[in-house]
């Protein structure tokens, strides 16, 4: 695992080789078992364009997910901290249809650290913004299959993502370090 810190528009990090090549193949095989959005099916725009499998802290973990959780704890110990007594880990296996986007936002206050693992071969990384309105310095995290980008959640960490330039489903694993016994429930915005 190779970590590169970046400081604009705010402090964040990019990781290469979070997953080994064998683990990336295993992840892609796992994703092949999950539903894929088609841009049509679903009763909301979000459900038509984004499918998410939530793995909450108290849920049992399959062997691949357990491996990802342990690797994330290792990453946390390098870029921040991790304590089983104070922190929980939540995962989201995300699949996003081409041409879709999510609004600029800051993460929920119970999130301490977010890391997005890039699974698909092609894609575009998380977009980082200096301001909530998208003005000022912007940066896109480099897409790195088996790697990804992350940040310590705090005031001013505005970000978004989209699949506007993609022609394939964007597959990622969002891993979040949370305050103990808190879960994040997303809205349909």
List each language-model region with its residue ranges.
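Catalytic core of non-heme Fe(II) oxygenases with the double-stranded beta-helix
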Residues: 73, 77-188
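Non-heme Fe(II)/2-oxoglutarate
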Residues: 2-82
């Amino acid at each position: 695992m190779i970590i590169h810190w970046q400081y604009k528009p705010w402090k964040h990090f990019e990781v290469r080789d979070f997953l080994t090549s064998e683990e990336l193949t295993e992840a892609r095989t796992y994703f092949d078992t999950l539903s894929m959005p088609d841009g049509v099916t679903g009763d909301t725009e979000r459900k038509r364009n984004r499918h998410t499998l939530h793995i909450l802290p108290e849920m049992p973990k399959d062997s691949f997910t357990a491996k990802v959780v342990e690797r994330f704890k290792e990453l946390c110990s390098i870029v921040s901290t991790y304590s089983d007594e104070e922190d929980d880990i939540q995962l989201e296996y995300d699949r996003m249809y081409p041409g879709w986007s999510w609004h600029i936002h800051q993460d929920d206050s119970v999130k301490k650290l977010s890391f997005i693992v890039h699974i698909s071969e092609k894609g575009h990384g998380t977009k980082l913004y200096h301001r909530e309105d998208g003005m000022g310095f912007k940066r896109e995290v480099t897409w790195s299959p088996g790697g990804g980008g992350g940040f310590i959640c705090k005031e001013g960490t505005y970000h978004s993502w989209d699949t506007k330039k993609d022609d394939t489903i964007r597959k990622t694993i969002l891993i979040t370090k949370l305050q103990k016994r808190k879960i994040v429930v997303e809205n349909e915005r």
